[in-house]
Amino acid sequence: MICPRCADEQIEVMAKSPVKDVWTVYQCQHCLYTWRDTEPLRRTSREHYPEAFRMTQKDIDDAPMVPSIPPLLAEGKR
């Protein structure tokens, strides 16, 4: 299995349906894309995933952190 968005092979199971074998949620450990195996091919298959939304390593490296992580407050100001 490869990630539909970035084509990485490091995919992990995030969750399984409470009813056995109904659905499974997967997450790419590289770009963090998450999908359920019951979604349409345009969301679950690299070949069908829209070109405009595919990501390269450069896209991932250049992606802004949204929302940005604020600086940690000093011990006495928490």
UniProtKB/Swiss-Prot annotation:
GO terms for biological process: catabolic process; response to toxic substance. InterPro entries: VdcD-like (IPR047707). Keywords: Aromatic hydrocarbons catabolism, Detoxification. The keyword Phosphoprotein does not apply. The keyword Transit peptide does not apply. Involved in the non-oxidative decarboxylation and detoxification of phenolic derivatives under anaerobic conditions, however the precise biochemical function in metabolism of phenolic acid is unknown. It is not known, if phenolic acid decarboxylase forms a complex composed of EdcB, EdcC and EdcD. The term subunit is often used in reference to the operon, however there is no experimental evidence to prove the existence of the complex. This is Protein EcdD. It comes from Escherichia coli O157:H7.
